[in-house]
């Protein structure tokens, strides 16, 4: 992915400046104790699990933002902070997570690294549940925005057909998920998944194959309900379009927020 491209750079500086102002005014803070001191002592790499928390308006829900990077990097600059800025400007609380990658996950094989990364997301949700009052968030009413690898993590946490899903770890499921160019193309909805709403966009030209999720849509819609699945596959769209600036989907974010609000009720 060419992260220096126009798709990303125009949003990046504004997002960093916005975050800097929030940190200075006390409206944003780095959370570095998601894993306990004991866990970090046992495995120092676990100190790499952190979150930048943006405090939103009272009564507005929380968005957890999970950037991608193929489990070899964290693309927070493109898929984290610009998204968080847009959400926070609308009043939402936001947690942008940065998670261990590569050998830090304790695995060498790519698929196992992905599974280990899902367990990092589990730990984030556990932390949020334990700190609801302190952070003024309601974990019965939250969403996850995941991009690329982060979208795979979001899928695997939210759907019951995965090993480390919310049901199995007994943690709250998001009301709505947004696995952008990241909805697992093998996803399968089970009865337990009823009540979950899914919004996703991918391109047919996606070089990692995320457009292949199209074949799963009839099954998803039959279980979750037509109104709860907004997944679109576009021609002439590749991977890694971030917030969508200068692409054929410049308004996906506004559509996503509309979908979220419609499914909070």
What spans do the regions from the language model cover?
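C-terminal catalytic histidine-bearing segment of alpha/beta-hydrolase fold enzymes
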Residues: 225-265
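Catalytic nucleophile-loop/oxyanion-hole region of alpha/beta-hydrolase
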Residues: 75, 100-135, 246-249
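Primarily recognizes the serine-hydrolase "nucleophile elbow" in alpha/beta-hydrolase
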Residues: 119-193
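The feature captures the conserved acid-bearing segment of alpha/beta-hydrolase catalytic domains
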Residues: 168-226, 230
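Short amphipathic alpha-helix adjacent to the substrate-entry channel of hydrolases
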Residues: 77-95
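Short, small-residue-biased leader/transition segments that mark boundaries at the very start
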Residues: 2-9
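Short beta-strand element of the alpha/beta-hydrolase
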Residues: 60-68
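Active-site glycine-rich loops that stabilize anionic/oxyanionic intermediates
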Residues: 67-72, 204
């Amino acid at each position: 992915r060419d992260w220096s491209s126009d798709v990303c750079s125009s949003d990046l500086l504004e997002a960093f400046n916005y975050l800097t102002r929030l940190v200075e005014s006390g409206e944003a803070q780095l959370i570095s104790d998601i894993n306990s001191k004991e866990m970090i002592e046992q495995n120092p790499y676990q100190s790499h699990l952190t979150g930048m928390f943006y405090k939103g308006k009272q009564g507005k829900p929380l968005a957890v933002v999970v950037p991608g990077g193929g489990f070899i990097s964290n693309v927070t600059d493109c898929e984290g902070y610009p998204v968080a800025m847009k959400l926070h400007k609308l009043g939402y609380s936001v947690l942008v997570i940065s998670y261990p990658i590569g050998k830090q996950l304790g695995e060498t094989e790519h698929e196992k690294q992905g599974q280990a990364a899902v367990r990092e997301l589990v730990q984030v949700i556990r932390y949020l549940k334990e700190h609801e009052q302190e952070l003024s968030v309601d974990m019965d009413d939250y969403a996850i925005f995941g991009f690329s690898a982060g979208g795979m993590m979001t899928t695997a946490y939210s759907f019951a057909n995965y090993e480390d899903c919310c049901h199995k770890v007994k943690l709250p499921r998001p009301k709505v998920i947004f696995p952008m160019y990241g909805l697992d193309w093998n996803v399968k909805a089970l009865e337990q998944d009823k009540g979950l709403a899914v919004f996703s966009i991918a391109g047919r030209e996606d070089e990692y194959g995320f457009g292949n999720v199209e074949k799963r849509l009839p099954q998803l819609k039959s279980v979750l309900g037509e109104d709860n699945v907004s997944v679109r596959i576009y021609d002439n769209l590749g991977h890694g379009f971030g917030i969508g600036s200068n692409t054929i989907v410049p308004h996906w974010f506004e559509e996503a927020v509309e979908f979220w609000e419609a499914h909070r009720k």
